[in-house]
Every structure is written in C-alpha cells, then in structure tokens.
Amino acid sequence: MVFSAFPRSGPPPRFRDYADYAEVVGQLERSGCIADYTHIWWDIRLHPRLGTVEVRICDAATRVEDAVAIAAYCQAVVKQLCERYEAGEEIPSYHRILTSENKWLTARYGLEASVMDLATRRRNRVPVARVIRRTVAEITPHARELGSERELEGILEILARGSSADRQLQIYNSNRDIVEVAREIADATETLPVSV
C-alpha cells in the first residue's frame, strides 16, 4: 500500500490493445520518465521480453506451496481471460476507484475482508473468501488444461488454514515476540516439500 504513492503503481489502466500499451510505454521512455517498462510498477504488468504477465499485488508467500498455488491461480485466470478475448467476448473492466478500494480492504483485513463483488455487482459487500472460491471453481477447467489443477487446490487450503500473514499475527499475538515471528518465516521458507 505504501508503494501506491508512487506514479505508475496500483491497478493498471485499461488499454485498447497491445499497440495502445506499447505507445504509452514508448512515450514514457522517449520522454525520459522511465528507462524501460520495468519502471512501471502496476499491480499487474506485462513483461514483453519474457512474454509473461507479472502479478505483483500480494505479499510474498513464505510457504513454497502457497507461492505455487498463487501462481496456478494467476495462470488459470490469465488463460480464462485470453480464451474469452480470443472468442470475442467482452472482458469486464472495473473502475480504478472500485478495484483500489477492494485492494485496500484485502490489504487491511486479509482473508477476513468483505469486498465489493464487482463481477456480480451485488449491493452489499461479500466475504473475499467467497469471491475466491467462486473464482477457483470458474478457473479449475483452465488449470486442468494447464496441468496445475492440484496446485490450484492450494488456494482452497490457504483459505482453510489462513495465509502466511495470519500465521505471523497468530504467533505474535500469542507471545509478543517478533523474533518468534521471524523464526516462523525462516522455518516456513526453508521447508521445501518433496512434491514441488
């Protein structure tokens, strides 16, 4: 959230197409505002040299399994959106104020957040966990095609047990010892499951 005070950060703007994106980035480069596209810090950005989409919105996962689950989730969402785009479907676009508000709510309250359900446009906020579960159900066929269905199920495991941040808060609240929190982070980070 602190980073959002900088230019070229936060939710990305909507572009008509890749040429529109390239023109904007080119203007920033030609004017000397940025050295290259890596100086754009949107929550989601293209990495043209690698041909990838970088999702830069969530905290680093301390558990390898969580990082893999988040990657599987992002891959399946991108695959779903690409297929919809290629089929000529309208891709939903939400006002930056609304997406920024949801970002704030989840940064502040984590998996306990209640957010605006932008896809259904419900009037009341809903638990973010419900939105995540629905999205997992929608993207599971895409994860299956990518060979990452099992990894995607890790998202549901995170919802069941809590995130790395939840675990860190639990440890700190139990003994008020930041060293124990650091130890937990180190232990979780060093433990590499055999299946990954």
Predicted regions and their residues:
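C-terminal accessory/tail domains of diverse enzymes
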Residues: 3-196
